[in-house]
């Protein structure tokens, strides 16, 4: 017997919707804070107890809700942010579906007090999505929402939550991204009474970066910006010497919304190409503005993923912007000093940079107050000492800008010796330099081969003894399809019997006496990839050839050899890292050396 089709109750529908919208406490925080942002808030307090499982309180000074709309706000698909289908394709707000409040209320105890500031406020309480009480409230402009006993009626959901530190980490990550996306809003976040994040809302993105990642990282960041007919990009990129083991420090923000987009992450990594070691990732915050018509945010329940109609163009703009920003800088990292010396130096730097006229004992630390400040709905909060630290933070000043028109990105260095036949020691008026000789020549060779491969020269060297290569049938078929692409990197395959190719010539710039080895490795590189990209094949080939043709460690060099290597390195377009992202050169300034030997105190 066929089962009858019935319409689900609103309570059950809301629970189903909550399964997509409210996955964990961080989802509640995200939705409620985004509502506060859409309401025009300038100050938002987030108070969390037990990673949100006990209580989540959001207080804002936004526009508030009219008394007659309070109950309506908890109906599914009730929203003030869009009115018709056309609005759906030009979304300017973070929320627009009208699902968050009813979904959250359906799986928790929720209390809300709100007012527009013009009349008395309204207070409403719900349990499991049902209104328990609605009455008059305070007239303070803004909204306060308290969510407790989350998932009380869906115990299965509780079983899938992680540990408290993990759930707290998820909340912190969400708020960090929101703060980066909205530097003009003051976010004050505390957990069990302990402040975890505090931004002053003055619109300075660099100060938000300092509040989240630390002052030392903010001081290593440089402004980046680019613009085209469709996109406007601004933000901060941290120098390659400061990097991380995962992509979590990459923040891409589109029209005020933090999003995850693999293509944009790849574009950012391309901008840092050869500047980062393998397996390391940059710290970067990009704010991207575009017409809402070319971005679809209605493709993911949590709106974390978007669909871009001009994704490739945006990616190219980002990559080029990052490359140009770093190409202007002198990216020589400073040598590490002893931990004790570092602590002394750090203390002195803070004293000089931020509080020059005050004794060291008065220097405050970020978020040193034991509890979060009492909520003040005013737009103008009283200045705090930690705000002063951020406001007076000096910008990063690259040495390269002192000689803006100079084509040489590293100074003239004079070799004074070699250590373990691996590292070159050199000096000039700026201090001591240590150069990895293999990495230095690898960078030089890489740029040479990259240029040669890109030219696709037809000047060929005939082989006295042609090379015959045999392959399994599947590899033979793949190579047959990709012969044209292989020719663009200097591999000219001719069919030679069953499952075999013959190579009769190679470009004249191939490394002498290593021609066959190079040809085989290029072919192996092409076969190892699921699909052959000519750009990647050229890049990988240049890296491979530069590594094999460069001097190795334990190779003694004469003074003339070292001078020639350093002079050639100065002519490289990116002389600071090898193609794999390892540093080529490290500097110890004269001042640092004098501090080590206590010549200055």
Curated annotation (Swiss-Prot):
Keyword entries, A-Z? DNA damage, DNA repair
Q: Which GO terms describe its molecular function?
A: ATP binding; ATP hydrolysis activity; ATP-dependent DNA damage sensor activity; mismatched DNA binding
Instruction: Quote the InterPro entries the UniProt record gives.
Output: DNA_mismatch_repair_CS, DNA_mismatch_repair_MutL, DNA_mismatch_S5_2-like, HATPase_C_sf, MutL/Mlh/PMS, MutL/Mlh/Pms-like, MutL_C, MutL_C_dimsub
Q: Which GO terms describe its cellular component?
A: mismatch repair complex
A Gene Ontology biological process in which this protein takes part is: mismatch repair
Q: What does this protein do?
A: This protein is involved in the repair of mismatches in DNA. It is required for dam-dependent methyl-directed DNA mismatch repair. May act as a 'molecular matchmaker', a protein that promotes the formation of a stable complex between two or more DNA-binding proteins in an ATP-dependent manner without itself being part of a final effector complex.
Which NCBIfam families does the entry mention? mutl
Q: Per the similarity annotation, which family is this?
A: Belongs to the DNA mismatch repair MutL/HexB family.
**Name of protein:** DNA mismatch repair protein MutL
Which gene produces this protein?
Answer: mutL
